[in-house]
Amino acid sequence: MDAQAKKKAMFRSKLNAKKKDTRIDSPLVRYNESDQPVCRVCNVVLKSESLWDVHQASRKHHEAIDSLKASAAGVQRGSKPAETRPTKIEALAKSSNSQTSSGLPPNFFENREPARAEVEPAKSKNLEQSKHTIGSETNKSKGPLPAGFFDNQKTDSSNTKTTSEPKQSQTQTTGPETKPMVNGNLPTGFFDNKEADLLAHGIKLVKPDIKDEYKEFEKLIQDDLQVVDSRMEEEEVDAAETIEEEEQREQRSYKEKVEILKRKKMELKAARLAKRSKTSEGSVKKPKKTEEESPSDEEDDEDSAVDWRAQHL
């Protein structure tokens, strides 16, 4: 296990050294937490350093550079619109004043309540004047009428006041501030549209920002890529280990075969030497027999010669 851990560490150190050698030295590139190159202009994560040249030649990169240049030029021109804004506001104020002068008088709606307050004391003055006139007429026409006949006039006037007051209250309520009142709470899901339902319950909708969602999506992709890279590294390490083990096994099998062949060769050499020794021993024994048989052959030759002479005779 220690040897395997050392091998893995060596393999990873080699990979890290290769990555360091291929780093991009450019002011437009930065590296994130996972040692991936990121374009500072486009804020795009590159999968590898070899794609930097392709990204520089891309249309998106050039458009981002042009937008940065345009924004820098807009910052320099930002002081001019600030100076022109007050003139627009003054023009709007003049137009509103002209409308009020042509149609309704200025502060028409603001002075509406004091006008109502002036109407009420005028009405009270008219009532008092009517009382005085009625009293004078009664004083003139006093005679057979009983005393205190006109004392009930106060109650009549009070009744008239009470009847006039609710009318005034009604006119006040039917002013420009009349709004429909909703009694009770609506149940959830009353509206088919979710936005309208939430607004009816007083819940403000938060519109999702596309940029934030895109950044979250990029983070998820980066996390997935990190997981994939780690798995690839582990698989490469495991594959390297398995390849080394297979090579070692093949070498062992080849060594065993070589040893077996050497043994067979030695056995064959020994067998050949044994055969040669046997054949050499047999050849040594045969010449002795020939030497022993040679005098008998000479005798046979002499006998045959004697027989030949005898035949001629």
Curated annotation (Swiss-Prot):
Compositional bias ranges of the Acidic residues kind: 232-248, 293-305
GO BP annotation list: negative regulation of DNA-templated transcription; negative regulation of reactive oxygen species biosynthetic process; positive regulation of seed germination; release of seed from dormancy; response to abscisic acid; response to hydrogen peroxide; response to oxidative stress
Regions of compositional bias (Basic and acidic residues) in chain numbering: 115-131
Distribution of this protein across tissues and organs: Mostly expressed in siliques and, to a lower extent, in roots. Barely deteclable in leaves and stems.
Phenotypic effect of disruption: Hypersensitivity to abscisic acid (ABA) during seed germination and to methyl viologen (MV) at the seedling stage, associated with a reduced expression of the superoxide dismutase CSD3 and an enhanced accumulation of reactive oxygen species (ROS) after ABA treatment.
CC per GO annotation: cytosol; nucleus; spliceosomal complex
Motif (Nuclear localization signal 1): 5-12
UniProt feature coiled coil, ranges: 232-271
Stated induction or repression of this protein's expression: Slightly induced by abscisic acid (ABA).
Annotated segments matching region Disordered: 115-189, 232-254, 271-313
Zn finger limits (C2H2-type): 39-61
Keyword set, alphabetical order: Coiled coil, Cytoplasm, Metal-binding, Nucleus, Repressor, Stress response, Transcription, Transcription regulation, Zinc, Zinc-finger
Bias-annotated ranges (Polar residues): 155-176
Positions of short motif Nuclear localization signal 2: 274-281
Molecular function in Gene Ontology: nucleic acid binding; zinc ion binding
Subcellular location: Nucleus; Cytoplasm
Function noted in UniProt: Essential for breaking seed dormancy before seed germination. Prevents reactive oxygen species (ROS) accumulation in response to abscisic acid (ABA) and oxidative stress, probably by repressing the accumulation of ABA-induced ROS-scavenging enzymes (e.g. CSD3).
Protein name as annotated: Protein ABA AND ROS SENSITIVE 1
Organism: Arabidopsis thaliana
